[in-house]
Each structure stands twice: as structure tokens, then as C-alpha cells.
Amino acid sequence: RPLLWKHRDASDLNNRIVHFEAEGGKLEFVGLVNGVDTMANEVWAGDNTSGFAIMNTASYNLKNDTSSLSDREGVVMKQVLGECRTVEDFARLLDSLPRPIGVEANFGVVDALGGAAYFEVNSYEVFRYDVKDSPDGYLLRTNYSVSGRPNEGYGYIRYDNAARLFSRAASERSITPEWITGVCSRSFYHILLGRDFTTDAWVVDQDFIPRRSTSASVVIEGVKPEES
């Protein structure tokens, strides 16, 4: 079944899972919400009763406009979870949103029909990457976009750290939710230094997958075709 991983860094380290009822024609869903967001206006990862799931990573090399509207990723994802049943629904919704959208992010999505993709989105443009087109059978993103400006953004070493872990696990067919949260989200291996710092008593908090701003690690298991 498809797996969607969200390793979240945030200023609010207190996150919670909120259940949203189906109201006003919206779909029922659950989502990851900031602790200080008492009205649950923003969702940072989640899945709905149609088997559609979404997460995002912030991008820092994709914005190419002067619009002041920004940081609307959580608002958009809450809307998406209430309205979208498939990856294609999500693609159509993105096309229909008024411009500027006010986002700069990589949105990862999966559905119950086997769809899985990343959408790299800024306020005016959408770039789509389907997992089915990846020779590895999976896609990874950190804090830059493949379609964005080269050599800008963040998380290049972090990406390589994750790519090393996934490459080995994929060859062994051992990628599971438990492995992702228990190994990947806790890995202190630094690929440039070729060393695992997990057992060190002191280490500079830089370039690892986990960091002091990590607030949550969530893996959403998708639905198989024969499941409801």
C-alpha cells in the first residue's frame, strides 16, 4: 500500500491530531494541527474517508513573484482534505484556486486508486511529479523543489541522508511505517561525513533528518484497491 511520510519542523512543538466531521457537503477527515491553533484553521498532514491523503514540505526556491500573500499551505490542505477524493481532484482544485494562491511548497498526495505524486506549487504555477514515473518506486522532498531555482533552498544534505536510507530499504523491500518513524525520523547519520552520530554525547544540530525544531513524524498508510 502507498505510504505518505511527513517529518515536520515547526515553531510550535505541540502538535495534535484533530478529527473533522463531514459537514456542509465536506468529507470527513483527520489532520495534524498546531497546538496553538485552537480553531484548527490549518492542517499540516491528514487523510479523509475517501482514502485521499496529503502533506507538505516548505520550499525555498520556488517563489517567483512579488505577492505579499504567503503561508497559506495549512489553509489550503484543510480545504483539500474536505473536498478531494483523488489525486486528479487535487490537480483540478489547484488549477481552480484564485491566484495568487499564497503558497511555496511541495505537496505530497496519495489516493485509494493508486495515485501518488508530488506537486511543487507557488502562487501561480504547479509542477507535477508522479511516483509511477520514478524508477525507484518512491519520491522524496525536503525544503527545495526540483522545478525551482538550482542551488537555492534548503535540505540538500538532509535529502541525501534520506535517499541513502530509502535506497537500501527499497532494495530489501523493507520500507514500513515503523521503519520510517523509528529509523528515518531518528537517524543522525551524516552522508557528507560518512558517520552516524546517534551514540555521540554531543553533536552540532545541523543537516540531520531530525532536529530541535522537529515537532512530529507522521506516516499515513494508503488504501489498497480492494479495501474500503
Where do the language-model regions lie?
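Secretory/export targeting leaders with adjacent low-complexity proregions
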Residues: 89-108
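C-terminal, well-structured catalytic/ligand-binding subdomain of enzymes
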Residues: 1-41, 45-46, 50-82, 105, ...
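Charged, amphipathic alpha-helical segments
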Residues: 86-95, 197-203
